[in-house]
């Protein structure tokens, strides 16, 4: 290892340099591109690392906002301890968020039906299959969106936002046959058994720490749920930047490969990944399936272009990680033999071995661990 140090003014602690013993103090906002990837085998400590970062950032930056996509219900104890909001998403969940919620921006003056057109078209592609979307469908969807957002615009944005159920009704009420065909495809998500995203928002989405728990989400609803969450997060990121340009937004995608398996969600995510920096937002992908990411063009671009990468213990994917980041043989061995909480941080051009063991007799450890028998 070459001796390198990270000591960013105003940063947070990521542990100790395994070579020098000095503290590693870093801040992703200081990088040109502060998006991050955290990669490790199961049990390597990636969940603990990410939760510690969230905890420190939340306490350090009191106006920052946080969104966590949680497929395994691992983040709820931390979120609840900090007074955040856990949004449980499933077919029969009592909590709802409306992906058609809209906040008007006086600076851009973009009307809601224009802002939501891309999302709704992607939603229809997801439900109907991209090959079944016709050339004129976008115009029909635009007409329906303009219709359902008209009361909101006429009220100067004081009326309730429309829902997917309103969109379904608007399409069904249009006279042409094709609109009714699109409405029929949407019906199960508007009034049927999959209407989880067709309700007005009934949770506190103004909370600065929100966790989307999708553990109980069925496979049939999952693609629509992923798109709806990404749309909601994108809208929130832009709204946060307008309301307070100096306050960063942090977005965490655990088991990010679940999003990347679906082409529409992957494309939506990659677009967000590239433009988040413009809105003072920082995305983090967390995965134990490095090889799956390396064989996915979108995921590979995200891995290769993230300036902040945390590599914890690696086994079967070690050679792929070594090749991607140009690791030396000592660095390779360090990752192979790493204990939970040990690894290598790539920050900009620096590659630093670190260790960050957490005392097991603390409330913080019990709050952050996912090991059976150790949780509070």
Please give the residue ranges for each predicted region:
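P-loop NTPase motor domains
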Residues: 1-24, 29, 73-85, 89-281, ...
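Short coil/loop residues immediately preceding or within conserved phosphate-binding loops
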Residues: 33
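Hydrophobic anchor at the beta1->P-loop junction of P-loop NTPases
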Residues: 38
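C-terminal regions of RecA-like/P-loop NTPase motor modules
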Residues: 41-42, 293-376
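Conserved lysine of the Walker
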Residues: 46
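Hydrophobic positions on the alpha1 helix immediately C-terminal to the Walker A/P-loop
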Residues: 49
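Post-Walker A helix-loop "phosphate-sensing" segment adjacent to the P-loop in P-loop NTPases
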Residues: 56-67, 236
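A short beta-strand-to-loop transition that corresponds to the Sensor-1 phosphate-sensing loop
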Residues: 72, 286-290, 313-315
